[in-house]
Structure formats: C-alpha cells, structure tokens
C-alpha cells in the first residue's frame, strides 16, 4: 500500500507505488501520541519530518539515498490521540497491526528494523508480544490436543516465526518503557483536565503498571532469544514540564546503548536537523550494521563514514552482534 492511501494502517514510504525493484531490508516506523485531531491522519509522516522542514519526511528522503535504495520503508498509522483515542491499551493497537502486518498482508523475507517514537515503542513491543504468543500457541497445539478456541492458525504461526527471525534491530526514540509522570502532567495541563492519565491510552504511560512491566519482561525475552539488537535515543532538552521521558525510562534495559540527543526535546528527538545530526547518523549506522547481509550495505557503510566521519569520531559507536540463522 502506498503512502497516498489513508484507509490502510500501513503506508509504504519507499519504494514508490508500482516500483518492483529488489530490496534487501525492511524498515517499519511506529509514531507516538497525538495531540491534535489533524495528527490522527498524518502522524505516520509528520512524526518523521526534518526539524524545521515539515515538508521533508526524512525516512523517505534520506534513507533510500544512504542505503543504496535497496530498502523498503513502511510507516504505521493508528489512533493514539491522548483524549479521543478509542483504544484503552497499546495491546489493542498491536492486535490490529498484528493482523495487518504479520498475519495477512506482507511477506517478511528480508532483515527487518523496527523504529518507534514515544508510545510507538510500546506499540511495537506489544506487537512483538503477540507474535511470540502465536508461536507459543503453535507449540502447544503441536504438543497437546488442538483447541478450536485458539485463534492463532498454523499459517499465522509460520508467518509470525518468519517475522521474528528476520527482526535484526529495534530503535527507540524517547520511549517511556518505565512510564512517565511528566507526560501525564503535560497532557493534563495541555487539555486542562484532571487525572487524564488514569483513562484510555494515556493509562499505558502511567508509571509502575504491572502489565507494562510484564511487557518489558516479555520483550527482553524476545530480544535475548532472537538476538535482536537494540539502540535507544533519549531527549536532552526539557519542555515546559521538564524532560518528559527520563534517561532511565528511555533505556529499556541496562545493557542497551542509549544516546542522549542534547539539543532535542521529546517531540524533536526523532526529527534530526540534518544528515550529519547524531540522531540520524547513529541510527543510520545501526541500520547498516543490522543489515550487513545485504549486497549494497558495505558500500553504504563506507559512504556514511565518508559523509559523517567527524560525527562518528565525536559520538559513541557500538558493535552489533553477529548471529546464526537457522533454516525454517
């Protein structure tokens, strides 16, 4: 589905509609909370614009250029408005995305990198939990008597397994893995409402929720079992209510790399100023390392170092683990 379609939750940013070129890597973007009614329809592009240039969707304009165009880029759309969203939990959004992304529409036969901003990171973690659940169901079906009440088919489990095995990396931009009181306060003040964070989708952001803690535990299991590489970015510049997602909440786990984007607040952290900006250059390095198997990625890596050598000298880099892929 191309980016011009508004009635489908997954929009293809690259390659253009009708382009049948061979691609070697899939990237899927998950946007965060929405503050206006207009955001509901456009967050899948407006979240990922160059800072100061709202007409430039940087994943569409920059990544194909720097990755040799051998990439397929999707951006996911869902209603995550802080007040009017019909969803009470990220799991409801993830359930719909599971059906549209994993179970029905796309074949996931390439390396995959998932990228989430704010609430979008929790959505993709919940999606991963549903994928894992479908595999557990498959195992139980093969080990015990089949139950007609089980909603996951064998075909669904096969597609889910292929999806998980191809996820090479996940990048988080200011995701409140441990919740955020400041986001709740910010929304309450913005909409002049009290205790909004106790209701609807905002309840997901509330700190110390047992179900969200379990979501992180389940996601860590997936990361460990499938050797998925993680990189996180956190905001370095406060908004009116301060830092909305603290470093400790944005990190996901103590073993993950987490880079503080000093000149960006919560809304700007996923909006790089230029290709040389660390929030883009480090992400690009991460994507390239996750997609080492692709034909054009070694050339792309050299190109990145040539363009941004000073950036990589001044900011932390990281070593992505190699992994062994079993046959289906």
Where are these regions (language model features)?
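C-terminal catalytic-base region of ester-bond hydrolases, centering on the histidine
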Residues: 34-35, 81-82, 185-189, 218-328
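Serine-dependent carboxylesterase/thioesterase catalytic core
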Residues: 31, 83, 91-220
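Active-site catalytic motif of lipid deacylating hydrolases and related acyltransferases
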Residues: 29-112
């Amino acid at each position: 589905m191309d980016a011009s379609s508004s009635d489908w939750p997954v929009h293809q940013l690259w390659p253009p509609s009708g382009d049948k070129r061979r691609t070697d890597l899939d990237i899927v973007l998950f946007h965060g909370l929405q503050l206006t009614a207009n955001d509901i329809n456009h967050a899948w592009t407006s979240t990922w614009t160059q800072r100061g240039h709202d007409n430039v969707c940087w994943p569409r304009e920059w990544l194909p250029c720097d990755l040799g165009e051998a990439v397929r880029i999707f951006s996911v759309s869902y209603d995550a408005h802080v007040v009017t969203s019909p969803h009470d939990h990220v799991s409801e959004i993830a359930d719909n995305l599971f059906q549209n992304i994993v179970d029905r529409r796309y074949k996931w036969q390439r390396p995959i990198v998932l990228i989430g901003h704010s609430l979008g990171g929790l959505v993709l973690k919940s999606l991963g939990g549903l994928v894992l659940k479908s595999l557990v169901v498959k195992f139980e079906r093969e080990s015990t008597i089949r139950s007609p009440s089980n909603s996951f088919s064998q075909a669904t489990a096969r597609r889910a397994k292929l999806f998980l095995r191809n996820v090479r990396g996940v990048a988080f931009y200011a995701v409140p893995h441990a919740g955020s009181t400041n986001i709740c306060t910010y929304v309450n003040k913005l909409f002049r409402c009290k205790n909004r964070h106790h209701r609807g989708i905002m309840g997901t952001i509330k700190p110390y929720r047992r179900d969200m803690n379990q979501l992180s535990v389940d996601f860590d299991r997936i990361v460990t079992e499938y050797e998925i590489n993680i990189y996180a970015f956190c905001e370095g510049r406060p908004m009116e209510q301060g830092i909305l997602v603290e470093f400790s909440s944005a990190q996901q786990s103590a073993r993950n790399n987490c880079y503080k984007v000093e000149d960006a607040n919560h809304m700007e952290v996923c909006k790089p100023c230029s290709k040389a900006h660390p929030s883009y250059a480090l992400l690009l390095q991460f994507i390239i390392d996750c997609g080492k198997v692709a034909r054009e990625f070694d050339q792309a890596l050299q190109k990145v170092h040539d363009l941004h050598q000073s950036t990589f000298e001044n900011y932390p880099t990281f070593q992505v683990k190699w992994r062994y892929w079993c046959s289906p």
